[in-house]
Amino acid sequence: MAKPILRIGSRKNTRSGSRKNVRRIPKGVIHVQASFNNTIVTVTDVRGRVISWSSAGTCGFKGTRRGTPFAAQTAAGNAIRAVVDQGMQRAEVRIKGPGLGRDAALRAIRRSGILLSFVRDVTPMPHNGCRPPKKRRV
């Protein structure tokens, strides 16, 4: 049986440009979720579409080091670096959770040069909802 002829420069093999479209975003929302185990920073546009995100785990911190303030600072810096290149100048910050990385992430956001219109704490508070887990005995 004859071998099929390979076409050089066929459409399948070539890639035209990048899939991610780069758009200018003047204003956005920075969501910081700080738990005791990890800190996740998500940057969205005003409509809520995710532009960039980072967490302490993706920055290379593993285990208990993910919950540290330094890990949160690094995660916030990584998430914001991408959106500053896309032209973001103003942002709102929404912080959720009781973790140690709350203040460190906010400090890193302030240092990035983005003007903050407001900082809001959106930590969910139960009105006597579910029973909390038992206290630790160490």
From Swiss-Prot:
Q: Which PROSITE patterns match?
A: RIBOSOMAL_S11
GO biological-process terms attached to the record: translation
Compositionally biased spans, kind Basic residues: 9-23
Q: Where is this region: Disordered?
A: 1-23
Q: Which UniProt keywords apply?
A: Chloroplast, Plastid, Ribonucleoprotein, Ribosomal protein, RNA-binding, rRNA-binding
Membership in a protein family = Belongs to the universal ribosomal protein uS11 family.
Q: What is this protein called?
A: Small ribosomal subunit protein uS11c
What organism is the protein native to? Barbarea verna
What gene is this protein translated from? rps11
